[in-house]
Amino acid sequence: VSRGLGDVYKRQIAVSGGNTPALMFDLWANEYMEITPWDRMRIYWVDERCVPPDDSDSNYGMMRNLLLGLTPILYENVFRIRGEAKPAKEAVRYSELVRQQVPLKRGWPEFDIVLLGAGDDGHTSSIFPGQEDLLTSNSIYVVSAHPRNGQKRIAMTGYPIQNARYVIFLITGKNKVDVVEEICHSGDTGPAAYIAHHAQNVELFVDKAAAAYIDDSNKKMN
């Protein structure tokens, strides 16, 4: 993240929710608080569950509690998705906000950093398997729905994610081994793999459990 910030005065960073980003936010607050240039960061969200900010499911609420509430960042530089609003209207509002504030490149917003997680089903940015058409939407944000519980979400689509200067995947847990394999090798088989194979600059950070496939591949090669 520090490398992605560089020397430019304001950097545009889009963050995700989920268990793995929560681990990063906690580490960030406890280990890197003092060296982070908070005055040079603008924070946006990749996706949000359609719930109020104080709901335990809120991605914004999680980051506020684990990190933002502990930092000196000005809230004028924090741009949350309004999960309590009507989903379709909020997707349009937030798309327009991002289009106006984030520099454009090739007609799409160019975030400096997009931080992504991945589910054990291969979803990312609240775009789930079977919803791959949302990846190629001409909108910046769209409404999606969880395939099991039907919970509405607002999700960044494929083109603005792929257009970011850095796309960083954070993946942990042995239940994500197959997802790591998809990302490393199989191309367009799921949303996370699709992004990994189409983004201009991708970095993958995994823990030992999620990296089991990579370890096995290296052993076979050796």
Descriptions of predicted regions:
Residues 1-9:
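Single conserved hydrophobic/aromatic residue that forms the stacking wall/gate
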Residues 15-20, 116-120, 172:
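Glycine-rich beta-strand-to-loop/alpha-helix junction loops that act as flexible
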Residues 26-37, 61, 65, 129-138:
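A glycine- and small-aliphatic-rich helix-loop capping segment at beta-alpha/alpha-beta transitions
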Residues 34-42, 72-73, 133-135, 159-164, ...:
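Short, conserved loop/helix-junction motifs that constitute active-site signature segments
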Residues 36-112:
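Ligand-binding beta-strand-loop-alpha-helix segment within the catalytic cores
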Residues 91-92, 125-130, 179-183, 216:
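A short secondary-structure junction signal
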Residues 116-159:
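Class I SAM-dependent methyltransferase SAM-binding "motif I" and its flanking Rossmann-like core
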Residues 159, 165-222:
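ATP/nucleoside-binding phosphotransfer catalytic cores, i.e., glycine-rich phosphate-binding loops
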